[in-house]
Amino acid sequence: MGKKKKRATEKVWCYYCDREFDDEKILVQHQKAKHFKCHVCHKKLSTASGMVIHVLQVHKENVTKVPNAKDGRDSTDIEIYGMQGIPPHVLTAHYGEEEDEPPAKVAKVEIPSAPLGGVVPRPYGMVYPPQQVPGAVPARPMYYPGPPMRHPAPVWQMPPPRPQQWYPQNPALSVPPAAHLGYRPQPLFPVQNMGMTPTPTSAPAIQPSPVTGVTPPGIPTSSPAMPVPQPLFPVVNNSIPSQAPPFSAPLPVGGAQQPSHADALGSADAYPPNNSIPGGTNAHSYASGPNTSGPSIGPPPVIANKAPSNQPNEVYLVWDDEAMSMEERRMSLPKYKVHDETSQMNSINAAIDRRISESRLAGRMAF
């Protein structure tokens, strides 16, 4: 714990005006002359409350503020005499010291982060406690009977399994199995006429050791047949003739016949390209020609006299009515017609006359 600093030079100062003095007696004389002096008879009093009582009893006046004081420190409720009676927070703010001391610093403990590969194995018979904080009492190691030391048996590492294919395969095409060792990945899209040599369809099987005659555990005597991945999207080009696969699969044990070249072509044609658009890629949708017989109520006519552009599925709207614009056509519709007041009054009068005649006719029929 740190010791609290003592004020080397505690100068006295006035609470009302923050003026510093060398002696408290001089401060008291200053307060009597500047802050506790009656403004009527100029009598010097000792405290602010004494000044208030004097002015009230003698001069019949009320004093609510201490004269010649700063804003916020002119209250007459606080009893000040020299340095006595000053609130603690004002003293703290004046001397620039904090009321509470900062907490003691805690020693920072750094835990070394060692990689997993660099951990040294410990003997079976002892368990070491974790690293202790400096200054704490270390715990004693604990002992327990452990299993006898044995040499670990040699473990043959298996090669990582290949990921499964998530795209469907074409059942009509015969895909030869690829060897597990010496596998060469196929491209995403089939590349033709590139002059590439085919990958060997099989690799020599692992032979047993000539000395022991035992195959190492975990490795099969013959590599399993792995399917060759097919392209993600089947691509068929009509300009390039389809070719047979550079290699063929071995005949199965059952003696099934290998599919012919015609079957392979038929199965390849079963997957048409997805970019086929009815009417061609440059097809456009054109409306019928304009109706030049006369103005008609309805949407404006559409004409397509422009040559088709490269962008597909476009509709060109052209207003070809030279006698009437789109606004005039809209104003000719009954929905947008505007009636004048004369026609409206005539229609109202006609409706009233019709009602009167109907009522008279109904009265005659009642008799």
From Swiss-Prot:
Q: Which UniProt keywords apply?
A: Developmental protein, Differentiation, DNA-binding, Flowering, Metal-binding, Nucleus, Zinc, Zinc-finger
Give one GO biological process term: regulation of DNA-templated transcription
Give one GO term, molecular function aspect: zinc ion binding
Positions of the UniProt region annotated as Disordered:
246-309
Per UniProt, Zn(2+) binds at C38, C41, H54, H59
The cysteines joined by S-S bonds are none
What subcellular compartments does it reside in?
Nucleus
Source domain of life is Eukaryota
Q: What does this protein do?
A: Sequence-specific DNA binding factor that recognizes the 5'-CCAAATTTTAAGTTT-3' sequence. Recruits the FRI-C complex to the FLC promoter. Required for FRI-mediated FLC activation, but has no effect on the expression of MAF1, MAF2, MAF3, MAF5, UFC and CO. Dispensable for the reactivation of FLC in early embryogenesis, but required to maintain high levels of FLC expression in later embryonic and vegetative development.
Quaternary structure, per UniProt, is:
Homodimer. Component of the transcription activator complex FRI-C composed of FRI, FRL1, SUF4, FLX and FES1. Interacts with LD, ASHH2, FRL1, (via C-terminus) with FRI (via C-terminus), and with SWC6, a component of the SWR1 chromatin-remodeling complex. Binds to MED18 to regulate flowering time; recruits MED18 to FLC promoter.
What is the protein name for this chain?
Protein SUPPRESSOR OF FRI 4
> In which organism is this protein found?
Arabidopsis thaliana (Mouse-ear cress)
Gene behind this chain?
Answer: SUF4
